[in-house]
Amino acid sequence: MPQLRAGTDSEAMNPAARKVQRIYLTLTLGNTLAASFIWGINTLFLLDAGLSNLEAFAANAFFTAGMVLFEVPTGVVADGWGRRVSFLLGTATLSVSTFLYYLLWQISAPFWAWAVVSVLLGLGFTFFSGAVEAWLVDALHFSGYDGALETVLGRGQMVSGTAMLIGSVAGGVIAQATDLGVPFLLRVGVLLAMFVVALWLMHDVGFTPERSARPLQATRAVLSASIENGLKNPPVRYVMLSAPFTAGVGIYVFYALQPFLLELFGDRGAYAIAGLAAAIVAGAEVLGGWLAPRFRRLVRKRTTVLILSGAVSAVILVALGFTREFWLALVLLAVWALVAEVGTPVGQAYLNDMIDSRQRATVLSFASLTGSSGGVVVQPLLGRAADVYGYSASLAFSGVIQLAAVPFLYASRRQRAAADEAHGR
């Protein structure tokens, strides 16, 4: 299949490709802004509703379980009905489920209700997980773009990080000035606006949905082809097997940082400080997106970046677990996030260069599913560790768990896939 160059080429971005990139960045900006309003205060929101640490992270695990359950079906929707349809369903589902979350907080609902709505939130996000990236890659190929995937994906990460920076800080400040529920209502409003924007701007190009009068048969066919391109493709399979350790830990750490930093700061009501954790991650996402294609040009293989990113970020997590100074914790948090984010666009480009267009959304959803499955197991376990031993210890445990991803990434490297070096079409 066609592969894009690892370097940057400004002349490769023709007018059609620039239009595709603008739409992609617009969708990324709106979606991330909507989501990030609550990222800095979500754990505090759940604890404020009366849940324990174990229940709060178990609710997050149900959200992740929803992603595991629906990743493949929604990927099939994207490949069978179109990436635009999938995106619109995602905004609608997330709007409704976020508002239900707000209502549960209002009435201090029992845990089972949080579990149910968390699964619905997971469903909403799975409509996005493979569809937007698949739409971008196919549209770029169709437009004749001959540059590096890392470049465009890195720009998307920079826009996402900027939106996350704005949204997470705003969410924390607004929560402190009003209450913890208002950021959730803001998320609903922005998601509804993004539904209108996507309806207007986003159209499937370079890809024809394979609809069928027999949806179950079509689902089996797409799923079978996706397994061939995914789990039965060794370099892709090993990347997928690394995901439960990297993504599963990443989900827990992101939300555990909120109460961890408040504990170090000494004021559990300083919601703006909790937003600061998300803001630091967002800033690292911006810088990481900018650095990724540049760092990629310094090494011969993409897996070099992935292995270094996974190993170094794991060691930093262990160090963070032994930190008792607030400002030192912020520095380690920033370095951890930056190292992790440099690897993200490189990993995305590596996978996309090994996947056939017809099953792209479903295989990418498979990859997301494996990461989410790790979160289902890791979050309750580490949440329980936080209850028993404290947040510091749980972060150190997180680093140890993440190190288990490195052998799988090395195994992918040993397959010598062409996408690992990808220097031309």
Model-assigned labels for residue ranges:
Residues 4-18, 203-241:
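Juxtamembrane intracellular "pre-TM" segments in multi-pass secondary transporters
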Residues 14-69, 235-278:
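Helix-loop boundary and gating motifs at the non-cytosolic
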Residues 57-59, 69, 251, 260-425:
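C-terminal transmembrane bundle of multi-pass solute transporters/carriers
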Residues 88, 92-108, 311-324:
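C-terminal ends and interior cores of transmembrane alpha-helices
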Residues 118-161:
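Cytoplasmic helix-loop-helix junction between adjacent transmembrane helices
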